[in-house]
Amino acid sequence: GGEDYLRTAEDSFFAVYEREGAGYFLKNFADFFAEDDLTVVNLEGVLTDNNALYPRDKGKGDDGYWFRGPTEYAKVLSAASVEVASLANNHAFDYGAQGFRDTIAAVEAEGLGWFGTYNKNRDPETEKFYFYTKDGVTICLMSLLWDDYNPQDPNGNGAYLRQQISEIKQSGQADAVI
């Protein structure tokens, strides 16, 4: 939980992190992840140390959920041999564009790759695909920001992502797109 009152609970993520360290949370998977070729996770939240950031309005009043943790929480992923994080989900911009940029910086500081598509404007700050090659086979990983997905919108992100999949396949940049 990213809300301040949840940080004080003895069994909160925050308290357990302080007590047990970054390696605790995925310790039962770390050996498995270390042996695989590529571990990919969905990072469902914002990593930022900027306490001046406020949750963005999701149009749900007080019924929405906003997730945030300090940037050091990226160590949870690197400690477990996670290599790549999808950042495109409905919580990516819970704390606005700055929160998103802070999340990217935190993930990159731990040596992790990331991917996600946020808009069709080809802004390198908000769009990235991840390419991985093993034994001569290249895959491209893509994900799409949930809030903006409307498959019926011919100018929306869904149409744009379908176009990108087609272009990557036709250009030979990847053998498979996931």
Task: Give residue ranges: language-model regions.
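Acidic, metal/ion-coordinating pockets
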Residues: G1-V177
